[in-house]
């Protein structure tokens, strides 16, 4: 069995799990997430824990058991605590402003960039150069952060652009005469 799948997923207080065929639903304080479980993976609930095992012993089934365990663990963490990703804007005149479901970005283009946030994702701007992207779906939070960063990735000479808060930008030396 996969080493990841051997570890059970602990269900914190206030988190409910429901099975309907191959559909797994996780409900918590922050919302509900659903996942289609692969047919080769068996999920069992016992004593406030979810256990994952492969129905047959082949390599793909063991791999899917580990993948499913990781996805369900992220779902449980998302509906109980949520996920957030912090972005920083570095550059003269680079600004961000969150207005409802739209993130307005001034990134040095001749036009402002308006990014429509998908359902289930919120954005906050504690300052004009910081963006906090929050949600319960880890994949979606990371996807939105990557798309916003993609508008103006950090460049290696001056470091200008949109970067993750924990990102280290490798700098290059300017050309010498």
UniProtKB/Swiss-Prot annotation:
Molecular function terms, GO-annotated:
rRNA binding; structural constituent of ribosome
Give disulfide pairs as residue numbers: none
- Known SUPFAM superfamilies for this protein? Ribosomal protein L6
Keyword annotations? Ribonucleoprotein, Ribosomal protein, RNA-binding, rRNA-binding
Q: Does the keyword tRNA-binding apply?
A: no
Q: Which GO terms describe its biological process?
A: cytoplasmic translation
Listed GO cellular component terms? cytosolic large ribosomal subunit
Determine if ATP-binding is one of this entry's keywords.
no
Q: Which family does it belong to?
A: Belongs to the universal ribosomal protein uL6 family.
> How does this protein assemble?
Part of the 50S ribosomal subunit.
Q: Which NCBIfam families match?
A: L6_bact
Question: Per its record, how is this protein called by name?
Answer: Large ribosomal subunit protein uL6
Per the UniProt record, the source organism is: Pseudomonas entomophila (strain L48)
This protein's gene is called rplF
């Amino acid at each position: 069995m996969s080493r990841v799948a051997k570890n059970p997923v602990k269900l914190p207080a206030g988190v409910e799990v429901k099975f309907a065929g191959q559909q797994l639903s996780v409900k918590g304080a922050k919302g509900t997430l659903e996942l289609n479980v692969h047919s080769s993976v068996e999920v069992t609930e016992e004593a406030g824990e979810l256990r994952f095992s492969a129905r047959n012993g082949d390599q793909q089934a063991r791999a899917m058991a580990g993948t499913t365990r990781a996805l369900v663990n992220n779902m449980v963490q998302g509906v109980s605590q949520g996920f957030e990703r912090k972005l920083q804007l570095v550059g003269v005149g680079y600004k961000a402003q969150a207005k409802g479901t739209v993130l307005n970005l001034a990134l040095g283009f001749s036009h402002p960039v308006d990014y429509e946030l998908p359902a289930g994702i919120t954005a906050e701007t504690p300052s004009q150069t910081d963006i906090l992207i929050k949600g319960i779906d880890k994949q979606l939070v990371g996807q939105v952060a990557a798309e916003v960063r993609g508008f103006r990735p950090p460049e290696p000479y001056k470091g200008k652009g949109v970067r993750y808060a924990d990102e280290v930008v490798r700098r290059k030396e300017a050309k010498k005469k």
